[in-house]
Amino acid sequence: MVIAQFKQGVVMLDRASVVDEQFLKRVLQGDFPQLRSSMSPDTAELDKKTAIEFFDSQIKSRLLDIIARQLKEKGLSFYTIGSSGHEGNAVLGQVFRASDMAFLHYRSGAFFLQRAKQLPGIDGVKDILLSLVAAASDPISGGRHKVFGSVPLNIPPQTSTIASHLPKALGAALSITRARELGLPSKLTPDSVILCSFGDASTNHATSQATLNACSWITQQNYPLPIVFICEDNGIGISVPTPSSWIKSSVSSRPGIHYIECDGLNIADVFAKAQEADYLARVKKQPVFLHMRCVRLLGHAGSDIESQYNTQEEIEQREANDPLLHTAGILYREGWMSLQAMVELYQDNRALIEAKALEAIREPRMSSAEEIMASIVPRIDKKQKYSLPDDNRRAQVFAGAYNQLALKRNLCQQINFALTDLMMQYPNMLIFGEDVGKKGGVYRVTADLQARFGQRRVFDTLLDETTIIGTAIGLAHNGFIPVPEIQFLAYLHNAEDQLRGEASTLSFFSSGQYQNPMVLRIASLAYQKGFGGHFHNDNSIAVLRDLPGVIVACPSNGPDAAKMLRTCMRLAYEEGRVVVFLEPIALYMTKDLYSPGDNGWLFEYPSPDEMISQGEVGVYGEGDTVILTYANGYYLSRQAEKVLREAHNISVKIIDLRWLSPLPKDAILKEIAKAKRILIVDEGRQSGSISEGLMTLLMEEASPRLKIKRITGKDCFIPLGTAWQYLLPSQESIIDAVIALQSDKREKESGRLVVS
């Protein structure tokens, strides 16, 4: 047999071999396990043809698991977490439409194969094999990761972080109704259902609990949510058992969520219960928790040795309940297939998969950094252009505030104006978060927006950042451009995986085919007077600095904020980008620059067509001493510049970075070309701050004759009251640092002065 080529010199992991051989042996003997549930094909209205199709998908999934381990032993495959024991989910791949977006668990092989049969031209077996061997021709990830995903099948790829996909599934469900209410074109049909599968152990994760809680919270407001949560309960999380009644007792009484239990070993029971779930979600638009009890075969993954935590008897007990044997028993008792026919189907599928595996291992893998990194940024699809709002529309929407547009305004007001203009321009833009509605946000940045655009486009969420960002991802899957708000920078850490693990990786793991554009607004940074402490004055953005493909913008003044926000929306809408927009809290209401009453930090609101391009820096002044800074640092540097010029006769050029990730390297190097001295003013902490990236850039790319110094925040949390001033850069410390740079005293390191 062809498989011998893989087996040569390889010892198959014992349990995979046992399960494989036992299936054939028991089928030939007609030795089938007793069903755990009473649902019959007749009662479930499951016909012969469909049942055999399910069996075929189950067999294919099982054999793919086995061959994945054989290939792994030869170094030809790289992933062995399989679907063995979960093959009952093949039924779900048929009951639900291929147009229903599915966020899948990593044990969804049979589901994927069965759904692939719904669309001509999709070879599910080949696609899975290409993914297993990390082939560059893998149609979903291009060999970047083993995922279940397909654009034609409406299956976005998911990460391996358990439960992390539940919040976006909820957001996608929300998007279906929201698109219909707003009369917007939708990628998903109005009667679509969102599917989200996961394991019993995942249900315990905080992210799952947050999503189920949010789901109940939304349904309590009688809002439609067509979603089916599919918990594939195999009774164990790697090595930790799940109490048999735990899932049911913890979920069945949740308000607003229908609980349906089914026997995942009985395809008739899954078929009947899945159709019930489909009706509740599709027709009644109500969320369902479908609890599918199954077993786990072959351990957690190929490297998992079950005997370390399970007895031989426990392992054999699970193997005796092989779902393939259960399905074979149903087919035999119904007279739909003979014993020999089932064996032949199994062996024919083995030959098919072996042949396709031989083809797959010959496929080239990615061979360069450029090729691998190509999908960090989504593919740019041609999008409908949205026109800027005309004067009549603006006058109508702004109403009483329209005449204020010509007045000089602060940062907070200019962001509000910009959001208003953008909401008029982009009908698929949604603003949401904690207190953004009637209250208008903690700092009134979103004041009056709900009155201007209604509760369907500007809405409050429950107080859970995981749900906020996850909802944004899900909405983006269906064509919306979400603009979620995180109330304070410190709160981002409650949900950073939704940004780091989910939103930022979708394009990468889908070869740029899927995108979840958004502009995530965060009230950020320190220097607030009379309010806060650390949790309202967090000055660390380290968590945002190393996210491939994510753009981080941070304005220092009103006009820049408006122009940059417009660019961020364009990047999200036209290029599918994920953008984080950091708004310096301390500058929201700032009016004066040099002295009380000078109104030096109030500016006219820029025309709606004015934008600042990504990577374009702000420049103020001239001189061979250059300050590189952003946000509050730019404001303080402007104050320091006046003193330096008037009291010390020192001319300073100040560069407002504006774009913190990726750093605007070309613009920086251009502006410092004639510089002799560089001062970096970074309000972030000394460790992990933007200053580190700037220092590296200057060391590697700038003139070795430059004198360089940085002043940063201390490696400390921000305290309550006024004590923060001892930790952060100030006007005085900037002045002192610039004066020190003028000295001829040099600490030399390769000819370069470095003072930190």
Predicted regions and their residues:
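Acidic, glycine-rich active-site loops and adjacent beta-strand->loop/helix elements
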Residues: 106-111, 198-204, 214, 231-237, ...
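Phosphate/diphosphate-binding glycine-rich loops and adjacent basic-rich segments that engage nucleotide
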Residues: 529-625
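Cofactor-binding active-site loop characterized by glycine-rich and histidine/acidic residues
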Residues: 66, 70-227, 237-256, 534
